[in-house]
């Protein structure tokens, strides 16, 4: 996936400012495709150059003009082309697993501490996932499409399942290391 296509997807729902896009990312796809404000504006500039979006300058009193971005027909065609294209499996790189691979060079306590920190992060992620439905409610009302909301829920389910599996692995690995301590 690319940031470009995520932005095209959001603009397909409605015209938005860069700030609106940042809020949309933060309350929806951030957990599997984060983007900061600078990346969003840089990408909007490129999308405008390609003719996939247009920008409407809305004058405001006592504040800078607002730039509202609109999806063009060419941008919609690109979004649909990308949506139909096959997806490659995810990048298999997991930095934690490289550390675990070489953890024989650490004490068991150090490795357990590493894994406990990882597990704590996963628990925090699950808590954040639990808040997503209420955060996304605003966008669900704006889109007014049960079909769209259904697909949003599928991505959340994927994230929850993946995170639970990683947490289960981390907890089981900690148990194995503790058993290794007892056998030594």
PLM regions with names:
Residues 1-93:
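Basic helix-turn-helix/winged-helix DNA-binding cores
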Residues 32-33, 101, 152:
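Tryptophan-centric aromatic hotspots in well-structured domains and transmembrane helices
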Residues 160-175:
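Amphipathic alpha-helical coiled-coil segments
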Residues 172-184:
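Long amphipathic alpha-helical coiled-coil segments
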């Amino acid at each position: 996936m690319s940031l470009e296509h995520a932005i095209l997807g959001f603009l397909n729902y409605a015209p938005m400012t860069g700030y609106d896009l940042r809020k949309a990312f933060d309350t929806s796809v951030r957990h599997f495709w984060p983007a900061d404000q600078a990346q969003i504006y840089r990408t909007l500039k490129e999308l405008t150059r390609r003719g996939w979006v247009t920008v409407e300058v809305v004058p405001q009193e006592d504040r800078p003009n607002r730039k509202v971005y609109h999806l063009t027909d060419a941008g919609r065609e690109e979004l649909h082309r990308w949506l139909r294209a096959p997806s490659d499996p995810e990048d298999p790189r997991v930095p934690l697993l490289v550390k675990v691979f070489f953890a024989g060079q650490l004490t068991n306590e150090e490795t357990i501490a590493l894994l406990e920190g990882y597990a704590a992060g996963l628990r925090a992620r699950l808590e954040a996932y639990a808040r997503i439905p209420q955060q996304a409610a605003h966008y669900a009302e704006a889109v007014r499409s049960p079909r769209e909301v259904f697909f949003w829920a599928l991505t959340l389910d994927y994230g929850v399942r993946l995170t639970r599996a990683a947490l289960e692995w981390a907890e089981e690995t900690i148990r194995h290391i503790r058993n290794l301590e007892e056998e030594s």
